[in-house]
């Protein structure tokens, strides 16, 4: 093929990447959504943290430049893309292999079954706007207000497998196997408010502390699209065009509002937070697929994609023509403990599983530790572990550093591996950058 399937997919999903669960930006790639006043991103995870991310003697805190986060995740199928590329070549040109037809059928029917069960590619991307998040401590009842905005995205690619067959008379291979791509583009702006709501007395296990409460409203514009692309139409020269065209034609945009609330108990040496996200469970519709195929021009990729979708909808029931994504209400607890003035540890856990916008199940556990240094060049280092407790059940090691007291760089490296081009590679990998005021 002139263009490998992997490269074509990365190019073609560019317009789509521009979801929700999937990637934490800035230092929260390592620490997760924990209640740490050192990170401005904490105010975007728990609205009650809006009161804590600005020091007492300050009134404002901002993020200088856009924050960025991206990660990818691969299914547990070795040489996923190599096998798909080779199969597309054989279907397009049977003379590209010298193996007997029986061997090709035995090999690829086994491979297709494996691809259908475990083969997938998922990617997530987030961008925050310059200056935002912006948090202001007011003089009114020690309350704080915050505003944040950004672009979040996600795509998920899976294989809808079908048997490979051989026509002895024509000497050709054929299969209804198709690629199933779901993607979304979310643009949002969030307003948050928080204030102290209770002074807590000294207890046997805690010093006097303060309980903060917060709430937020997030206006969301979410574009969702899904498509089915038969691999027989992917000849390697127009993969990007086919996927991009179908993304546009199946696109549907929905606008809704998500409300969240949270509390943080601050006792100085440690903090405990509780977040209740998407209280109203907002809904967003995907564009329909596999409908009105007769109205599309015959012998075109659009017609083939529509008919392939209709087949898997009507005969197999593996996908649905019309689908609604619900951002289900979910809860999370987190904690932060300071061993010393420089060394701390944090953790957070989702209390229930939920689906991201491309249908993958998530329930994340984050553990991290951070050490602060007395220098301006490398003021902090952090190391973390995150694990999806359901769904794909993958785990990753995360590391990060703060640079020059305003920049953050964090990396994610999966602990599970697969094979790509004969070499071992992590099934998850991510990177996050941020530039914000740090105190």
Predicted features along the sequence, with ranges:
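Subset of outer-membrane beta-barrel
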Residues: 19-439
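Gram-negative bacterial Sec-dependent N-terminal signal peptides
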Residues: 1-18
């Amino acid at each position: 093929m002139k263009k490998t399937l992997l490269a074509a997919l990365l190019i073609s999903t560019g317009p789509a990447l521009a979801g929700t669960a999937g990637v934490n930006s800035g230092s929260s790639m390592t620490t997760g959504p924990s209640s740490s006043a050192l990170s401005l991103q904490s105010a975007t995870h728990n609205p009650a943290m809006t009161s804590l991310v600005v020091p007492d003697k300050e009134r404002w805190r901002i993020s200088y430049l856009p924050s960025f986060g991206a990660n990818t995740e691969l299914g547990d199928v070795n040489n996923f893309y190599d096998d798909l590329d080779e199969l597309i070549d054989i279907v397009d040109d049977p003379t590209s292999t010298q193996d007997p037809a029986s061997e090709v059928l035995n090999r690829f029917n086994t491979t297709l079954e494996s691809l259908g069960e475990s083969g997938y590619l998922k990617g997530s991307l987030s961008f925050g706007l310059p200056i935002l998040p912006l948090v202001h401590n007011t003089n009114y009842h020690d309350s704080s207000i915050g505003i944040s905005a950004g672009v979040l995205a996600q795509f998920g690619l899976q294989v809808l497998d079908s048997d490979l067959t051989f026509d002895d008379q024509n000497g050709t291979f054929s299969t209804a196997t198709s690629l199933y791509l779901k993607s979304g583009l979310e643009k949002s702006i969030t307003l948050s408010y928080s204030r102290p709501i209770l002074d807590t007395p000294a207890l046997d296990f805690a010093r006097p502390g303060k309980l903060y409460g917060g709430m937020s409203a997030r206006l969301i514009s979410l574009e969702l699209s899904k498509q089915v692309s038969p691999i027989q139409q992917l000849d390697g020269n127009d993969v990007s065009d086919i996927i991009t065209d179908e993304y546009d034609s199946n696109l549907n945009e929905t606008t809704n509002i998500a409300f969240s609330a949270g509390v943080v108990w601050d006792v100085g040496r440690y903090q405990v937070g509780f977040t209740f996200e998407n209280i109203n469970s907002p809904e967003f519709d995907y564009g329909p697929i596999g409908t009105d195929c007769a109205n599309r021009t015959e012998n075109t990729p659009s017609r083939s994609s529509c008919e392939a979708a209709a087949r898997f909808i009507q005969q197999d029931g593996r996908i649905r023509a019309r689908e609604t994504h619900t951002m289900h209400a979910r809860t999370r607890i987190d904690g932060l403990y300071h061993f010393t003035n420089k060394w701390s540890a944090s953790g957070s856990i989702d209390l229930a599983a939920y689906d991201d916008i491309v249908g993958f199940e998530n329930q994340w556990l984050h553990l991290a530790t951070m050490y602060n240094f007395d220098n301006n060049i490398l003021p902090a280092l952090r190391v973390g572990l995150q694990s999806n407790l359901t769904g794909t059940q993958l785990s990753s090691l995360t590391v990060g550093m703060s640079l020059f007291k305003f920049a953050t760089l964090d990396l994610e490296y999966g602990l599970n591996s697969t094979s790509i081009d004969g070499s071992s590679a992590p099934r998850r990998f991510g990177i996050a950058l941020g530039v914000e005021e740090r105190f």
